[in-house]
């Protein structure tokens, strides 16, 4: 199942999220909006497994990369008792 992956303009081009992704969903593309002149991009969201390792690896205060799980994934997680 594909999940929605959003990259925000707060990305500093550090490549931490790209290296953390186990399924190579993310890649860096040229961008003039930061010192690194690159920003994360998510061209292969159909391969996203929703592990959110990219979010954990992001060093910015406001996570620059976010994975939004679909309703199906949320429902299948169940309730904790």
UniProtKB/Swiss-Prot annotation:
It is found in: Plastid, Chloroplast thylakoid membrane. One of its GO terms (cellular component) is photosystem I. It is an enzyme of class 1 (oxidoreductase). Residues 2-31, 39-68 form the 4Fe-4S ferredoxin-type domain. Its cofactor is [4Fe-4S] cluster. Binds 2 [4Fe-4S] clusters. Cluster 2 is most probably the spectroscopically characterized electron acceptor FA and cluster 1 is most probably FB. [4Fe-4S] cluster 2 binds at residues 21, 48, 51, 54. SUPFAM superfamilies: 4Fe-4S ferredoxins (SSF54862). Its EC number is 1.97.1.12. Keywords: 4Fe-4S, Chloroplast, Electron transport, Iron, Iron-sulfur, Membrane, Metal-binding, Oxidoreductase, Photosynthesis, Photosystem I, Plastid, Repeat, Thylakoid, Transport. Apoprotein for the two 4Fe-4S centers FA and FB of photosystem I (PSI); essential for photochemical activity. FB is the terminal electron acceptor of PSI, donating electrons to ferredoxin. The C-terminus interacts with PsaA/B/D and helps assemble the protein into the PSI complex. Required for binding of PsaD and PsaE to PSI. PSI is a plastocyanin-ferredoxin oxidoreductase, converting photonic excitation into a charge separation, which transfers an electron from the donor P700 chlorophyll pair to the spectroscopically characterized acceptors A0, A1, FX, FA and FB in turn. HAMAP family: PSI_PsaC. PANTHER family: PHOTOSYSTEM I IRON-SULFUR CENTER, PHOTOSYSTEM I IRON-SULFUR CENTER-RELATED. This is Photosystem I iron-sulfur center. The gene is psaC.
């Amino acid at each position: 199942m594909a999940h929605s992956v959003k990259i925000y303009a707060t990305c500093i081009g550090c490549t931490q999220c790209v290296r953390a992704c186990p399924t190579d969903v993310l890649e860096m593309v040229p961008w003039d909006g930061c010192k690194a002149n690159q920003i994360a991009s998510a061209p292969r969201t159909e391969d996203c497994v929703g592990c959110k390792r990219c979010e954990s690896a992001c060093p910015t205060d406001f996570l620059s990369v976010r994975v939004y799980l679909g309703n199906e994934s949320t429902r299948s997680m169940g309730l904790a008792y």
